[in-house]
């Protein structure tokens, strides 16, 4: 017997029993975004490696350690580790943002070579939003308000909380970086080798360290908010005022910097403790210099991404009231040579006139007992039974499989009206 080929570590299949919840969440995301007037875009999964190096930053963990990169002839390519860089590349290349505001969204798989754990995989899925050409804090507020609405739609709003910060301009951040490095140089004895490397290459990333001893020291470190330029300070104050007025609760977290180099001014994360240790469900911020950095005209940008695996786990954990639609509403069983054609014609008629229903026709043979077992297995609500006599009399037997009520015989001409009443 040939050896089974297994899925790659950290890359998972989605089974028929799991996919309805995924579809339910994805549809909620689509509907909320449509309600705010956002347009879907679709970008390639593979991009040129320099795109991510320039956008995300050479010294970030994502670029230096986590990307799936390969050579195609003389071109270095990478499976996308996130969606913003590719969306900005497409917006520049296709002219979507030339003298134009854009509110865009996308959904799909991303790839990072990191240690697989609950809710974090090597192939994972994100829904992302990118807004271009709007410098005002009102759009930052809209993105946060939009996500808050989505959490209510998903029934998880009581289990997520918003953390907010401003990391200012590049110049303000450079001044803060110098002050932070000067402070941390007195505490290198507490640092791991990796943290010492970060101190040299990307010191702001030390702010979100998991090192407990270093966390305590950081409580006395210089605060980024104290180094903000006037424009960033005013932008952040107006954002906070809008969120207060809209009743959006938040915590200003001075250690929040996000893991990608392109951010400036506003950064935010929605976090949860419902999955064990605190985890990020959604994160984003402003990236006003990224379009120009990647070769476009100076264009402000702001966006966020949410991890769908984390959302699936969170919804499963805290929302037990979901009524997921069944894949099969009506199961058509039949027996007899003449009944086969009649069954297929009837099923097609239902699909045409009641397209919201899932209709499955039995195709694997067997007696009625076997066919009903299959109908039960797929959890159909209604079974329609057609035999030779039903074909002759142009009737159909309707059996409610969920209630166990007595089966009824109805004219085939009345079937659509009867199903409309029941669904």
UniProtKB/Swiss-Prot annotation:
Subcellular location: Cytoplasm
Superkingdom per UniProt: Bacteria
MF annotations from Gene Ontology: ATP binding; histidine-tRNA ligase activity
Catalytic activity of the protein: tRNA(His) + L-histidine + ATP = L-histidyl-tRNA(His) + AMP + diphosphate + H(+)
Enzyme type, top EC level: ligase
Regions crossing the membrane: none
Family to which the UniProt record says this protein belongs: Belongs to the class-II aminoacyl-tRNA synthetase family.
Name of the featured protein: Histidine--tRNA ligase
Lineage per the UniProt record: Bacteria, Pseudomonadati, Pseudomonadota, Gammaproteobacteria, Pasteurellales
